[in-house]
Amino acid sequence: MNSTSDDNPRPALRALTPLEARVLGVLFEKQHTVPDTYPLSLNSLAAGCNQKTSRSPVMNVSESEILDAINTLKRLSLVLEGSSSRVPRYEHNIERVLGLPRQSAALLTALLLRGPQTAAELRLATSRLHSFADTSSVEAFLEELAGNDPPRVVKLPRTPGERESRWMHLLCGEPSAEQLRGAALSDEPLPPGELEGLRAQQRELSERVERLEALVVHLAGELGVSLDDLKGRL
């Protein structure tokens, strides 16, 4: 497995705030999903932080709050400000500071933006950041992140009803005692922001399925075959 990290432990960063983690995640995400607009302006960064889809929890933060987070991340060398534009633009420095290869940074980004995820969920969530061959490949990079000094992720105990364990990033500090004990999340109501984030993800997946179904119908028409014929070949 290729890695940009070395054998020496990285200096420990102080725990990030949720907003600082969101800013860092948005910068890495947008670098790979909308490269033409990267580095990001403050306005674009605010839109990414307050995005309703692919975010858990959903946030509603001001540009001044984001700017405070940026200034802190700049002092930690995690964010850099460009000087070649009249409008200030910002880029992440996560791979260099944390000593991570792109694959690991992509997984960490998904955890920063979406909260705890299973390896299978992470493979889907990172599809536009890095294409993992299979879930086993995702798990291998997660295990590497967990073995870093200091560790960057942790594998949470499975909660009742869960088939797979979820992974959580550690950039905002250690998980709570309840998470480590595997307390059943279903016993407590979800916070409004997290519930809205899950609903937004569900809508996003439904829209993606609809687009794929429409594409299949179009391709079937181009090939001159019926959908029943295609189903019979699967």
UniProtKB/Swiss-Prot annotation:
Ranges in coiled-coil conformation: none
> What family does the entry list?
Belongs to the UPF0502 family.
**Any one Pfam family match given in the protein's UniProt record, by short name:** DUF480
UniProt organism field: Paraburkholderia phymatum (strain DSM 17167 / CIP 108236 / LMG 21445 / STM815)
Classification via InterPro entries = DUF480 (IPR007432), WH-like_DNA-bd_sf (IPR036388), WH_DNA-bd_sf (IPR036390)
Entry protein name = UPF0502 protein Bphy_5360
